[in-house]
Amino acid sequence: MSALCPLPTPPASEALLLAQARQLSGYTLGELAAMAGITTPKDLKRDKGWIGVLLEIWLGASAGSKPEQDFAALGVELKTIPVDSLGRPLETTFVCVAPLTGNSGVTWETSHVRHKLKRVLWVPVEGNRSIPLAERRVGSPLLWSPSEEEDRQLRLDWEELMDMIVLGQVERITARHGEVLQLRPKAVNARALTEAIGARGEPILTLPRGFYLKKNFTQALLARHFLLQNP
C-alpha cells in the first residue's frame, strides 16, 4: 500500500514542497487522481486546468486563483508544463492577467508578472495527445528563480508591451511581440470584454489579455536544468 498522500496543509518550507513534488515524479495522472479520490476526465477540452488542480491538491497549494503565489507563505508559484518525449514544452505558459488600465507608475520591479515569476516550481507533465490523459506521467520538478539575464529579457518585453498598453495600442499587439514574453487575448468567449485605453486616450472595450511565457524561454530553462539537448 502506498504511503504517498496529498499534503493536507501548505508545506512549511521549500524543501518539504520539493520533496513532495519529487515523490510524484514517475506516477501517472490517473494514479495520482485515484489516490486523491478524484475522477480523471477523458481529455482536457472542458477541464483545461485539471492537471494544475490535481497537483495543487497533492502539493497543498493555498492560493487557487487569487493574485498571490500558489504557496503564498513560501512565495512560490506552481507551474505545470506539458512536454514532448524529448522534454520540450508543447505550449506557452500563462503567467497572469494583464492590467489594461490604471498603469501609471507601475514598474517591472513592482509588476504582477515579476511577482509571479520570482520563484516557480516547474512540474513537467507528458503532454503528447497520443497518450491518454490518465496514462501521462509526471516528470521531475524544478525550483527556479530567474537569472539576471532571464530577468533582463522578461523586463524588456514587459516594458515594451506595457508601453503599448499605456499608449492605447493594445489592439495592435500580436503574439509575435516580445522575445520571451507575449500578450494574448484570454477570455472564455468573445463577449467577455474589459475596459482599456484607445489610440486617442479614450476608454474602449476589448478582450482581456494575459501574459504568457514563450516556448523558447521555458525550453531553455528546462534544458539548462535538466541537461536536455537544446536545439
From Swiss-Prot:
Sequence-specific endonuclease that cleaves unmethylated GATC sequences. It is involved in DNA mismatch repair. CDD domains: MutH-like. GO terms for cellular component: cytoplasm. It is found in: Cytoplasm. GO terms for biological process: DNA modification; mismatch repair. The gene is mutH. It comes from the Bacteria. GO terms for molecular function: DNA binding; endonuclease activity. It comes from Salmonella paratyphi A (strain AKU_12601). HAMAP family: MutH (MF_00759). Belongs to the MutH family. InterPro entries: DNA_mismatch_repair_MutH, DNA_rep_MutH/RE_typeII_Sau3AI, DNA_rep_MutH/T2_RE_sf, Restrct_endonuc-II-like. It holds the Pfam family MutH. NCBIfam families: mutH_TIGR (TIGR02248), PRK05070.1 (NF003458). The keyword DNA damage applies. SUPFAM superfamilies: Restriction endonuclease-like (SSF52980). Keywords: Cytoplasm, DNA damage, DNA repair, Endonuclease, Hydrolase, Nuclease. This is DNA mismatch repair protein MutH.
